[in-house]
Amino acid sequence: MDVTRNTAVIVVPNRLDFAEALEHLQRVVYNGSKEDHHPDALHAEHFRSQVTIFPEGQFVAIDPHTGLIVGHTSSMLLHYTPGQPFTQPWVVTTDYGRLTPHDPLGDWMYGVESAVLPDYQGRGVGSALYAARFALAQQLNLRGMIAGSTIMNYHQYVDRMTPDEYVSAVVTGLVYDNNLTKQLRKGFRVLNVIPDYVSDELSCGYGAAILWDNPAYDPSQPSPLPSAA
């Protein structure tokens, strides 16, 4: 059953047999910048681990006309204390994308990864995948979603701005960032800058911790996730 639709894609739960296609998608999206030895690279084994550990949090976007997987998003659950900085590198939080730190009793969703094929970017695919994430957060009565946003355009400003200055400029709209700006428009807010967040030249390794509050969160109600019962 499809979770959500837009004019371009159908978003459905990820499956074990999609793993090889998703590994290929990652290689295309990152255009060789994440080779096999790269610490942030996701392989078929990682996607199988994600589906096995937390199937509810994994989604793919499929072109209904061709059957091609054109995007995906991965998430896990964890505990987070609001108001505290979030500074963990991506590889630590996610165990290199395997999701073994996933906590079924976690009250926050953590955004592990989201990627869309270049030919499908700008067509609402990313928004459809985020909509699936937000819907799941509301279904599970989570407090919200936290993630690290790789600041993809920082390399263009590294000689002029510190990471904190750059993120502040993105937040105020003075600078456009290919990643963070889009997430701010989806309702996220910035918590802090994360040094050594990822191994990435474009961001110089920096990320911004971002948070989305679930407007439907009801603290008097438990999460309905079966594994959290």
Q: For each of these PLM feature ranges, what is it?
A:
Residues 29, 34-65, 69-80, 91-100:
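Active-site rim helix/loop that mediates acceptor-substrate recognition in acyltransferases
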Residues 224-229:
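Short, cationic low-complexity segments
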Residues 56, 204-209:
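Short hydrophobic/aromatic beta-strand or adjacent loop that forms the aromatic wall/cage
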Residues 7-24:
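A short beta-loop-alpha structural element at the N-terminal edge
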Residues 116, 122-137, 144-147:
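Conserved acetyl-CoA-binding loop-helix of GNAT-fold acetyltransferases
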Residues 73-113, 131, 151-178, 184, ...:
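Conserved acyl-donor/pantetheine-binding loop and adjacent beta-alpha core of acyl/acetyltransferases
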Residues 22, 133, 179:
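Aromatic/hydrophobic pocket-lining residues that form π-stacking "cages" and hydrophobic walls in ligand
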Residues 23-30, 47, 130, 137:
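Hydrophobic alpha-helical core bundles mediating ligand binding, dimerization, or RNAP-core interactions
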